[in-house]
Amino acid sequence: MILSEFIYGGMDGVITTVAIIAGILGAEIAPKYALVLGLASLLADGFSMGISRYTSLIDVSKAKVTPFMSGLATFVSFVLIGGIPLMPFFFLSFYDETWIKRAMIWSSALALLMIGAVKGMHTKKYLKSISEIMVIGLAGVMISYHTAKYVKGHLIHGI
């Protein structure tokens, strides 16, 4: 059961964090805000995911894993794995924006690859698991980036 929380929390953490960053970049907002919004979202969403998982299991769970451990695993995975795409933004004062954006893309891909590999270790279908996780992650990023780009260009002028 902890493995499913790891995959669930990590996947949602990466997609949520990258979606925020992609939205900021798509709306052409200064990348320095990605760190502020990314960290705030990472912790608040991680807490929400963990506590929601805990409360959803507390009265109905007959599993070997306690609802607390399930919720904790979801939170920890969300924050640790979801924080990987945010790491390059800690180096904004040392590198240019292009480097930061590229590092974010590569670190995001690495985080998704790790989740897919862990899932693949469980299912024994490595390529399928990694491909599935990567496609879902890419879809989340594209939705966020293009939504922000559209909103900035068509609905909100002068941001």
For the regions a protein language model found, what residue spans apply to each?
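Hydrophobic, small-residue-rich transmembrane alpha-helices and their short perimembrane loops
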Residues: M1-P88, K101-S107, A111, G140, ...
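Short helix-capping/hinge motifs at transmembrane helix termini and TM-loop junctions
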Residues: A27, F89-S93, H122-T123, K152
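Residues that define the loop-to-transmembrane-helix transition and helix capping
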Residues: P31-K32, T98, L127-K128
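Membrane interface segments of multi-pass transport proteins and intramembrane proteases
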Residues: F90-W99, I156
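Transmembrane alpha-helical segments of integral membrane proteins
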Residues: S108-K124
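Cytoplasmic-side transmembrane-helix entry/capping segments in multi-pass membrane proteins
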Residues: L127-I136
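Juxtamembrane boundary at the C-terminal end of a transmembrane helix
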Residues: Y145-I159
